[in-house]
């Protein structure tokens, strides 16, 4: 019999911060706007607020390309305002969840910048960097956003990095224990700030086919959708270890 968790039988409400409530007139929703609506949301019967990404980001994919997991993007407010939101929610017996986007980061993240400067160095192992096939991508996988999942590394004729989504969203290498530990540290840090938990984004994509085998093409571009690999590997023990 499954033990009852605190979130069972709770009402959750997703907030997309950009379009929720603007308090400073710049046309972009912000953290003070969320705070201002807590009483209203409580009156509606909401217990849990799941907030889409507000981390620092170049916003190539609406915040799902994170350049700093420890910072709030200035368009939404400050870290002090985030802490105030958590505090005000707790006063009302409400819980704050944030999106946890760790299948990939932003190409502007410090780790990736260091990886591009030295693909064979320590930070290169934080990502999936592979040699191509005579200058062509290592596999025929298609990204969720179209085109190859592989992008050639500037300055190299035959080295590529993998991105399941946009090229500005390089996939993190979950086979690397150091990467896992750094992400776990980040999760613990946010919990220490008072966050109640996370909604995990794109979790089905973190396990890769390490044989790097081509798939049967499913379109005229000669590529095959990368999500098919996620369906194949969705139950593998290493994926469950991460969760």
Each model region followed by its residue ranges:
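Intrinsic low-complexity/disordered segments
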Residues: 11, 230-233
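Single conserved hydrophobic/aromatic residue that forms the stacking wall/gate
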Residues: 232-243
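N-terminal structural segment of carbohydrate-active enzymes
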Residues: 1-198, 203-207
């Amino acid at each position: 019999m499954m033990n009852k968790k605190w979130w069972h039988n709770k009402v959750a409400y997703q907030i997309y911060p950009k379009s929720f409530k603007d308090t400073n007139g710049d046309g972009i929703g912000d953290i003070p706007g969320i705070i201002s609506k807590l009483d209203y949301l409580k009156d509606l019967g909401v217990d849990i607020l799941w907030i889409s990404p507000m981390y620092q980001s170049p916003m190539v994919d609406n915040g799902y390309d994170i350049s700093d997991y420890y910072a709030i993007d200035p368009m939404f407010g400050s870290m002090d305002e985030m802490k105030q939101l958590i505090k005000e929610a707790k006063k009302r017996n409400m819980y704050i969840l944030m999106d946890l986007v760790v299948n990939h980061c932003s190409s502007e993240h410090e780790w990736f910048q260091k990886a591009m400067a030295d693909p064979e160095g320590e930070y290169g192992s934080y990502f999936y960097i592979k040699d191509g096939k005579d200058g062509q991508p290592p596999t025929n996988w298609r990204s969720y956003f179209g085109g190859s999942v592989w992008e050639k590394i500037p300055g190299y004729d035959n080295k590529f990095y993998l991105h399941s989504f946009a090229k500005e969203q390089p996939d993190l290498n979950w086979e690397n224990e150091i990467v896992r530990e750094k992400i776990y540290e980040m999760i613990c840090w946010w919990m220490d700030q008072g966050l109640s938990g996370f909604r995990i984004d794109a979790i089905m994509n973190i396990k890769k086919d390490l044989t790097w085998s081509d798939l049967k093409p499913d379109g005229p571009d000669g590529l095959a959708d990368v999500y098919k690999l996620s369906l194949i590997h969705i139950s593998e023990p290493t994926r469950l270890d991460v969760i």
